Structure formats: C-alpha cells, structure tokens
Amino acid sequence: GIDFRDYPTSLELLSSAGAEVDGERVRFPRGMCREIITASAPAVYTHHGRNPARSVQVGGNATVFAPAYGSPFVHDLDEGRRYATIGDFHNFVKLAYQSPHMHLSGGTVCEPVDIPVHKRHLDMVYAHLRYSDKPFMGSVTATERAQDSVDLARIAFGDDFVEGNTVMTS
C-alpha cells in the first residue's frame, strides 16, 4: 500500500472510490488505478514548448525522449565524480536543448547542491525557461514548489495559454 500522511481528505476520497484504507495506508484493488486514469486522462495530448515547433505529442504511438532525472552526482574529466552544481544544471539543460534526439529539456536533470533547497526549484525551472524553448518538467517536491513552477510557466507562456494547454509535466 501507499501511506498518505497528513491528508485525511485524500483518505476519505480514496475510500469512497473503492480503495481499502487502514489508518493512513491505502491499498488499491487490482485495476482501480488503471480504470481511474483511463476514464479521466486523455489518450493523447500536446506538451507545449515556448517554441511551438518544439511542442510534442504525448500518448498514442508517440515516443518522447527526456534527459535522466534527479542525479545528485555528475562526472567530469577534471574532477571525476562530484556533487552537481547549478552550473552543471545549466549545461545539461543546454545539452538537451541542442540535442535533436531530446524532445524535452528535462526536469531535475541533476541536483544542484550549491543552491539552498528552499529556492533550488526556482533556479531549476528558470534555467529551463532561459536556456531552452523545449517542453520541460516542473518541480513537485512540495505543494508550494509545484505552485511556483506553475507561476513561472504563467510568466513565460501567459495566463490564458497555461489555462488551456499543457506547458509542464512532472
């Protein structure tokens, strides 16, 4: 099962939908999640980039390539294996942007430990917006970070466009 800590509303909602709730642990009957997703998610959608020519179809028979996600370490010829920095993050976003084989610039392409955690997500999303015009993934490590990602997307794409289109995934 999955523990949903400090979210009693979620527990009530999942229980009423047919999941087995035991305290904070939720167990989903076989097929329940697939049924919910199939009934509510589109089979195909467009993930928009700032450059419309780089927008990609997700779903159907489409294959979408994105960089690796979340590595705390990088490796270079001078220093070998080391913790990632925001400079490394910028370089990976630029590399993904330049690669004709990458459809997205990514999300957390590496974890820049030289930036304080409470503001790191802002620097990362900004890097995607500054160094690439491909679709990207926002930060979802906390509710407020997800909201910050949406707010930055609104600045880049405009409120009306964000309301009616997929400009970020995670």
Question: What does each of the following model-derived ranges do?
Answer:
Residues 18-20:
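Compact, charge-rich alpha-helical regulatory domains located at protein termini
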Residues 6-10:
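Short, glycine/acidic-rich hinge or "gate" loops at secondary-structure transitions
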Residues 1-4:
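N-terminal alpha-helical targeting/anchoring segments
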Residues 11, 27-170:
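Catalytic alpha/beta active-site cores
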